[in-house]
């Protein structure tokens, strides 16, 4: 695509997309489809397209995948050339060449880096891999020429950008060496604590290649060059063609240099596959990182455009930092350290010349404009059962000058001056000038815009990856030494004695008090399970969020074909182990280093172990099990932070904690039914301090601190400890468990059962009582040894502290932090002048925030005294705290990744749009892209830019990435291949008779699939407005014909391999239950399983089999429950209700296994591949037959029509609290009002708490959706005695009488709303969560004709219309409107009668009631004869016609606060 094509075809269409209002939305979307089609053709080569006459939005697009080297190389050279031309298009030469000298210096530095073989041991073990040359430029050039001159099959194993099949290439060839002077390769020694010699050898070339691949790969889901092209295109459109990227200029000059003037060689030496994977890096080590820097930098400029508005100074600062990073790709940590304290103490200096000027000075806005909350008092502690914001108004003045002077102390000034000097020392003069702007107080959003802009520069490196072993050792070794010194201090007045004197009794008392409250029934809804309940409900303890439990891999022979299968399902892991998950006999209580373990073996045993290791008969994980060692995993973060360790817990320890302390965790999660009595956690009283009590996914959790920052009357004190887990000693944790044990011992019945865990070494009584389980776990946690492994290097670490994979990590960290905070508050009150009083506090694991009434604070000495008290106390309690990071501020703060300033809230721009932290676990490309859609949605809702632009950007990227690979043998090759390549392809296919070659094609589903809702198989559900995913109503009202034109095709996109393997496995394990096989449809479309071999990364896993899980589940069935369930099933049959066998209680073991197998994923390369028959079928369908019916997937939307009425008289001057939102989000907040009061408990599509509680209480695997479907499809409610029928139904699947009665009452009391996939609307999790979305507030934007419909149904329509209004507001350039809902009268009568159980109360409201539609004039009368009575005197017949889903209202009842 030439620059002229982009300028003449793409630019105007994108402008029309972004500037058109509602009246032009259809044409705008057609333009979007055309742009996508053009970009896809450009990406794949229009001459490679098959059936190019087809409508791409109806049938999709098919391309031959290029595999011939020269053709592929030329195409990529063309893509890069187009990118460079686009960058230079209509840009002055002076602008283009402005930084050429610097860029030339960067390229020269790369090509003069030390050679790979010159790296010494210190280099290769450094945290960040040093820069080095992989080969000389001459060697690279010669290799490229040689590579392109060889036949496609002449080099075995060479990677290819299009990932073509290389498995059958000729072996008799010479491999091209992509590293210069391989003869200089040498052996390097890696530390290995699992080796008898404590070291292992590998080659230098292998090790650095592995590190390069592991640490540089951004894990994209698409190739970066099209992403660069799209990003630059949008930047050009927004700036009228002026945008210019010096990152792309660097790419251009580099490609010109290394190609030596040959256009076909002018491609970037970091090679990516079409799926975004980094395939190889040539010539120089850090090219992949530089590609990441360039793409991320351009993306931040585009998506956070409102922070800079493309002003010259900001763009110059951006370019300066980008060029610095390109020159110093490992320099991100230095840059981050240079501005660390500026990031904490920005906007803190009161400057009368600027702060009170109320005007713009040197381009900086000093107007005073932020929300204030006058209703909030800080004279007494704030003790409330639920945190929420109070009403706000605009603040235009500043009146806390004395407090300003106290906070901005000499110490703080020195911090800031030092950071500015560090930036200057990095030779970044423009950034230095920018940071100087961040010092003075600015009570408006502009300072937040500036701090976020600076943080985008810190985050352009994406996810940081480094040498895990080096990073772990850098922290763990020093802290282990510190801990050992602490533990060895036995003096009476020592640090250990002082802490144990006050903390351990408090820990024990808290553990005792909370346990006692739970056992006495004071914590409503929380209880200790019996031993039998624990086993029956094992699924509730092993959830997807059970960190630290190993994953499962297995090899499956299905129909003679071997599949490598993986699953991250914790349930699958449990099912493979069976009852062994409760057996502690295999867990060593004396973990050892290997060297220590060997001393316990005699010579013969040592030799046997040596031989087994040498012959690979014993794997690493088995050796770790023998030594009692656990595994350390890792996770990456952004902003160049070191990799963090994740300590993997063994399953037995996890379950023991679930039984012991799980109820405590449950007692501190969610709103407390008993209001707190005081600030502090005592055990008997939970207090107000646990963040988990108030967390709802919004900033409500710290609303009091945010409001206080606008008052000018309070101080926020923020404690930031480093490596909290490693300094939280096990010795400090055990007293809490001892308190639990004491309470359980006193409460005799709680310790009367002995089957929680097993110890097979005890011959008399195998089972363990709960107190015995506590003793075992306390002994277990005293000392562990964890082993970290990275690219062949392995280190074992002694751990006598909290480890991150434990169930109780967050809870116990919060407990200790709360106790320390209480102690600090007492000390501040008693020792600091003026006795400042704490009015509110909160802890979230290792984060703590305290808010003090500052009326008595007049000097910096008082502030410094508070800081010293905080630092001294945490230090005395064995934690590491940096005084410089202990922020005390009257206007700003950061806690648990929530930032605030002067009553305004914002987020760090750390979410990455392009990169992934980990390799996707999705089973197919549709799931991958749906995951990307969710990431893009999350990214865009906090990006300070245009939501319309950013949403379009995400859709364009997804359109190019959403492709399916299809391979077929040559005799199935696609017809209609272009003649230009036909003869060449035929020649290649016949060149070597002994090789089976393939025709490989790439299929793009209909382009409308990107916005097609996910209720359609191939739909991604991406957002048009940015408000929500799956925008069904908007599509229905504005774009229905376009989306439905190819809907039938989109709904046939499927991936069979995973399903075939999982179903075949299920049939294998059900081979003795032919009735279940037939009912589940496993008798067709499956293949015989010949063999299964299990493996796991968990040290507790020595062997496994799903047969173990089935046996364990069958044994755990309660005989009494089984009898009840069978009786209920028989009663249901007697009235004609037949339940699917898989849902009955007696078949629960099999349904559990079935659920485990649904999450398996087979060979990675198949996740993007489908069978050729499907694509042939899709292509053969006439366009006229591709049309589908979207509303049939979402039938609720067929009940009504929405009409928009423009309304310009709405109030639009509400103050703005949420700054990290797009421009449209702030406009909506100004229109609707900021989030205020208690909002409804919206968690999206999920479940009514009563139904979820029933499922969890009974350990069921059925989902809430399936349970409701079962209630509906069984017809149990539409017969006589519907309540009793439901009791029998729930008893048949659970065997539990009490919970079945409770759930039946819940249903019949009309509390649930029928769930189906009809409503896909989210308030929480979208930018609308920032607005006051209470029904009393939003009703002014909605009108509904049928005003006498039941209140809950009216609420549903109100919220649908409200979201639709917000979508229209965004797409119509922030034009306010009102949405008028008219009900479809033909369906209203059936809907009202059939949507729910009809109680007597509802009957009284319904009989003879007239429902009228003001527009149509139609009146519907419902008389008593239309409702037949039943034998149940309380309820009437329900004839289910249509299930209704209202997920976001499920916690509401009439009259509840909105």
Swiss-Prot record:
Domain spans labelled RdRp catalytic: 686-894
Location (main, coarse): virion
Keywords attached to this entry: Host cytoplasm, Nucleotide-binding, Nucleotidyltransferase, RNA-directed RNA polymerase, Transferase, Viral RNA replication, Virion
GO CC, any one term: virion component
UniProt GO molecular function: nucleotide binding; RNA binding; RNA-directed RNA polymerase activity
Region (Disordered): 148-168, 971-993
Basic residues: compositionally biased ranges: 979-989
Domain of life: Viruses
UniProt xrefs under InterPro entries: DNA/RNA_pol_sf, RNA-dir_pol_reovirus
One of the GO biological process terms: viral genome replication
Catalysis: reaction(s): RNA(n) + a ribonucleoside 5'-triphosphate = RNA(n+1) + diphosphate
E.C. designation(s): 2.7.7.48
Enzyme class: transferase
Keyword Cell inner membrane (UniProt): no
Localization per record: Virion; Host cytoplasm
Family: Belongs to the reoviridae RNA-directed RNA polymerase family.
Primary role: RNA-directed RNA polymerase that is involved in both transcription and genome replication. Together with the capping enzyme P5 and protein P7, forms an enzyme complex positioned near the channels situated at each of the five-fold vertices of the core.
Name recorded for this polypeptide: RNA-directed RNA polymerase P1
Originating species: Rice gall dwarf virus (RGDV)
Lineage of source species: Viruses, Riboviria, Orthornavirae, Duplornaviricota, Resentoviricetes
């Amino acid at each position: 695509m030439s620059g002229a094509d982009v300028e003449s075809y793409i630019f105007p269409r994108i402008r029309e997309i972004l500037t058109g209002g509602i009246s032009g939305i259809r044409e705008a979307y057609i333009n979007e489809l055309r742009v996508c089609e053009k970009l896809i053709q450009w990406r794949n080569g229009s001459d490679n397209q098959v059936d190019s006459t087809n409508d791409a939005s109806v049938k999709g697009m098919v391309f031959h995948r290029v595999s011939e080297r020269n053709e592929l190389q030329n195409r990529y050279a063309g893509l890069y050339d187009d990118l460079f031309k686009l960058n230079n298009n209509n840009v002055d030469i002076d602008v283009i060449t402005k930084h050429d000298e610097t860029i030339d210096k960067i390229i020269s530095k790369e090509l003069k880096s030390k050679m790979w073989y010159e790296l010494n041991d210190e280099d290769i073990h450094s945290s960040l891999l040093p820069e080095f040359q992989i080969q000389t430029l001459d060697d690279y050039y010669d290799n490229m020429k040689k590579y392109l001159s060889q036949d496609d099959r002449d080099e075995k194993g060479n990677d290819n950008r299009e990932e073509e099949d290389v498995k059958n290439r000729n072996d008799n060839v010479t491999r091209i060496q992509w590293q210069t002077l391989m003869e200089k390769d040498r052996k390097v020694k890696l530390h290995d604590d699992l080796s008898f010699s404590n070291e292992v050898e590998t080659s230098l070339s292998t090790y650095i290649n592995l590190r390069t691949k592991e640490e540089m790969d951004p894990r994209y889901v698409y190739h970066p060059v099209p992403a660069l092209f799209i990003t630059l295109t949008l930047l050009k459109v927004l700036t009228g063609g002026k945008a210019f990227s010096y990152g792309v200029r660097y790419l251009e000059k580099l490609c010109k240099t290394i190609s030596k003037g040959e256009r076909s060689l002018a491609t970037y030496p970091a090679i990516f596959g079409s799926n975004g994977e980094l395939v190889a890096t040539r010539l120089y080590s850090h090219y992949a990182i530089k590609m990441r820097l360039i793409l991320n930098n351009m993306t931040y400029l585009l998506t956070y455009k409102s922070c800079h508005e493309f002003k010259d100074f900001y763009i110059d600062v951006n370019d300066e930092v980008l060029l610095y990073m390109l020159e110093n790709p490992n320099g991100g940590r230095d840059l981050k350290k240079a501005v660390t304290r500026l990031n904490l103490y920005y906007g803190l200096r009161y400057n009368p010349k600027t702060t009170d000027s109320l005007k713009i000075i040197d381009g900086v806005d000093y107007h005073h404009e932020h929300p204030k909350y006058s209703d909030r008092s800080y004279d007494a502690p704030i003790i409330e059962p639920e945190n929420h914001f109070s009403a706000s108004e605009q603040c235009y003045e500043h009146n806390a000058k004395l407090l300003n002077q106290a906070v901005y102390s000499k110490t703080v000034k020195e911090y800031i001056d030092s950071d500015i000097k560090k930036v200057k020392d990095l030779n970044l003069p423009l950034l230095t000038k920018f940071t100087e702007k961040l010092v003075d107080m600015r009570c408006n959003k502009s300072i937040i815009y500036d701090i976020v802009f600076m943080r985008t520069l810190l985050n352009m490196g994406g996810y940081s990856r480094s040498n895990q072993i080096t990073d772990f050792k850098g922290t763990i070794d020093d802290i282990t030494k510190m801990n050992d010194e602490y533990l060895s201090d036995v003096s009476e007045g020592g640090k250990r004695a002082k802490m144990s004197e006050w903390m351990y009794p408090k820990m024990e008392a808290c553990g005792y008090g909370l346990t006692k409250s739970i056992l006495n029934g004071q914590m409503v809804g929380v209880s200790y399970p019996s031993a039998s309940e624990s086993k029956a409900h094992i699924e509730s303890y092993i959830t997807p969020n059970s960190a630290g439990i190993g994953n499962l891999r297995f090899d499956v022979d299905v129909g003679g074909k071997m599949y490598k299968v993986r699953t991250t399902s914790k349930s699958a892991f449990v099912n493979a182990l069976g009852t062994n998950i409760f057996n502690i006999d295999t867990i060593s209580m004396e973990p050892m280093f290997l060297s220590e373990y060997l001393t316990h073996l005699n010579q013969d045993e040592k030799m046997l172990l040596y031989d087994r290791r040498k012959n690979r008969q014993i794997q690493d994980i088995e050796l770790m099990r023998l030594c009692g060692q656990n595994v350390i995993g890792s996770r990456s973060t952004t902003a160049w932070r070191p990799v963090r360790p994740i300590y993997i817990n063994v399953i037995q320890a996890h379950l023991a904690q679930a039984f012991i302390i799980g109820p405590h965790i449950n007692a501190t999660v969610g709103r407390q039914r008993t209001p707190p009595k005081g600030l502090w956690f005592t055990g008997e009283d939970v207090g107000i301090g646990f963040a988990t009590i108030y967390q709802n996914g919004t900033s409500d959790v710290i609303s009091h601190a945010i409001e206080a920052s606008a008052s000018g009357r309070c101080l926020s004190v923020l404690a930031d400890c480093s490596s909290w887990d490693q300094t939280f000693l096990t010795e400090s944790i055990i007293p809490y468990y001892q308190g639990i044990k004491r309470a359980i011992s006193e409460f005799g019945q709680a310790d009367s059962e002995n089957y929680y865990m097993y110890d097979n070494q005890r011959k008399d009584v195998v089972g363990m009582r709960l107190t015995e389980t506590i003793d075992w776990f306390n002994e277990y946690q005293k000392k562990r040894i964890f082993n970290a492994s990275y690219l062949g290097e392995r280190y074992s670490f002694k751990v006598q502290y909290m480890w991150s994979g434990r169930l109780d990590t967050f809870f116990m960290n919060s407990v200790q932090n709360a106790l320390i905070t209480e102690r600090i508050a007492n000390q501040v009150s008693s020792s600091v002048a003026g006795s400042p009083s704490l009015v509110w506090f909160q802890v979230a694991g290792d984060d703590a925030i305290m808010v003090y009434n500052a009326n008595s604070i007049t000097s910096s000495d008082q502030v410094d005294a508070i800081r010293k008290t905080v630092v001294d106390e945490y230090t005395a309690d064995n934690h590491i705290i940096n005084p410089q990071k202990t922020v005390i501020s009257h206007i700003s703060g950061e806690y648990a990744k929530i930032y605030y300033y002067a009553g305004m809230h914002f987020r760090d721009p750390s979410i990455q749009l392009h990169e992934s932290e980990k390799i996707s676990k999705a089973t197919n490309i549709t799931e991958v892209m749906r995951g990307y859609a969710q990431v893009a949605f999350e990214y865009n809702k906090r990006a300070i830019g245009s939501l319309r632009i950013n949403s379009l950007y995400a859709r364009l990227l997804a359109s190019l990435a959403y492709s399916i690979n299809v391979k077929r043998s040559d005799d199935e090759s696609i017809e209609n291949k272009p003649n230009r390549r036909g003869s060449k392809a035929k020649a290649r296919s016949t060149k070597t008779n002994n090789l089976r070659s393939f025709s490989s094609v790439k299929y793009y589903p209909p382009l409308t699939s990107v916005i097609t809702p996910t209720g359609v198989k191939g739909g991604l559900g991406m957002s048009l407005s940015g408000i929500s995913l799956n925008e069904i109503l908007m599509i229905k009202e504005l774009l229905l014909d376009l989306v439905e034109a190819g809907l039938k095709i989109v709904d046939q996109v499927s991936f069979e391999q995973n399903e075939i393997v999982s179903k075949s496995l299920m049939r294998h394990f059900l081979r003795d239950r032919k009735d279940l096989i037939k009912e589940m449809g496993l008798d067709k479309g499956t293949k015989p399983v010949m063999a299964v071999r299990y493996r796991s990364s968990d040290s507790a896993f020595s062997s496994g089999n799903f047969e173990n899980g089935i046996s364990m589940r069958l044994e755990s069935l309660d005989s009494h429950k089984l009898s009840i369930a069978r009786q209920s099933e028989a009663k249901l049959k007697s009235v004609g209700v037949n339940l699917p066998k898989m849902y009955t209680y007696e078949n629960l073991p099999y349904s559990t296994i079935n659920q485990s197998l649904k999450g398996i994923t087979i060979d990675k390369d198949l996740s993007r591949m489908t069978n050729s028959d499907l694509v042939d079928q899709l292509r053969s369908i006439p366009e006229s037959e591709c049309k589908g019916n979207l509303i049939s997937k979402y039938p609720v939307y067929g009940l009504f029509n929405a009409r928009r009425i423009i309304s310009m008289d709405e109030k639009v001057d509400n103050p703005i609290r949420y700054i990290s939102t797009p421009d449209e989000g702030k406009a909506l907040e100004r229109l609707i009002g900021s989030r205020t009061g208690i909002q409804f408990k919206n968690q999206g599509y999920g479940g009514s708490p009563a139904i979820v509680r029933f499922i969890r209480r009974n350990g069921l695997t059925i989902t809430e959706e399936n349970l409701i479907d079962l209630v509906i499809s069984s017809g149990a409610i539409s017969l006589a005695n519907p309540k009793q029928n439901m009791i029998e139904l729930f008893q048949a699947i659970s065997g539990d009488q009490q919970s079945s009665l409770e759930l039946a009452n819940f249903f019949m009391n009309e509390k649930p709303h029928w769930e189906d996939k009809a409503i896909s609307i989210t308030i929480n999790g979208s930018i609308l969560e920032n607005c006051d979305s209470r029904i009393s507030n939003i009703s002014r934007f909605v009108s509904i004709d049928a005003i006498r419909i039941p209140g809950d149904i009216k609420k549903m329509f109100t919220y649908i219309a409200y979201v639709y209004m917000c979508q229209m507001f965004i797409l119509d350039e922030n034009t306010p409107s009102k949405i008028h809902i008219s009900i479809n009268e033909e369906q209203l009568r059936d809907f009202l009668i059939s949507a729910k159980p009809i109680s007597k109360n509802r009957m009284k409201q319904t009989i003879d009631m007239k429902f009228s539609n003001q527009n149509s004039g139609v009146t519907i009368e419902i008389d008593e004869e239309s409702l037949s009575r039943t034998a149940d005197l309380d309820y009437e017949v329900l004839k289910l016609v249509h299930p209704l889903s209202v997920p976001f209202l499920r916690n509401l009842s009439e009259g509840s606060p909105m």
